[in-house]
Amino acid sequence: MVVIALGFLVGALAYPFIPGHAIDQMRGARAQIAFSLPLTTLIIYLLFRSLWRHDRVRSGNGAFEATYHAIIFRTMVFVFGMHALLMLALTDVMDVVGTHTWGKRVVVVMLGLAIMAIGNLLPRTRPNIAFGVRTARTLTNPQLWQKVHRVGGYLTVALGAIILVAGIVITNNAAAGLVLLLVVLAVAIMFFTYRRYASA
């Protein structure tokens, strides 16, 4: 909840300084810009909290709760970081800290860090309805779930690390293409990994 409150606080502080004549002419546009991402963070929190309460698949699996909430928290921190960066870019603060020059790279680096942070937790997950490779087999076979998500965790951390480095050393357009290619490759590897373990 602290992350959510901070997001709304940052939006409220930046609200009067968000510029643009088009924004002034569009009723509610300034509020949408200032509070859309904090609202998204709140929705993420409420949605996954509801899924946890109504998840019958993970019944009796209390050890997974800390990992579940850690993944949600890291996702929320990423959204908050994006929001804070956006507010910096849209207000006069950008002239002080120079977000025009490094802002886009920071977005890619933040994405890489978030993917690594979440991927590091995937091997600790257990069958649930919220996230992961959710098929009839993985949801009913904890051993299969663990095998698939162990590989998925390694892949996700590696993907995040490459994205992080790409954000630092590669141009923005090239980084976007590389990220897309790596995501497709990771999904393909996960598909064949699942098929391999499921048919074993």
Kindly give the residue locations of the regions a language model identified.
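Alpha-helical transmembrane segments
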Residues: M26-L42, H100-I118
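Alpha-helical transmembrane segments and their membrane-interface junctions
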Residues: G11-A12, G81-T99, A158-A175
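Alpha-helical transmembrane segments of multi-pass membrane proteins
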Residues: I4-H21, I44-S50
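Membrane-water interface of transmembrane alpha-helices
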Residues: L42-R56, A117-V133, T193-S199
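Terminal transmembrane helical module of multi-pass membrane proteins
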Residues: T135-S199
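Ordered, amphipathic secondary-structure segments that act as subunit-interaction surfaces
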Residues: L47-T101
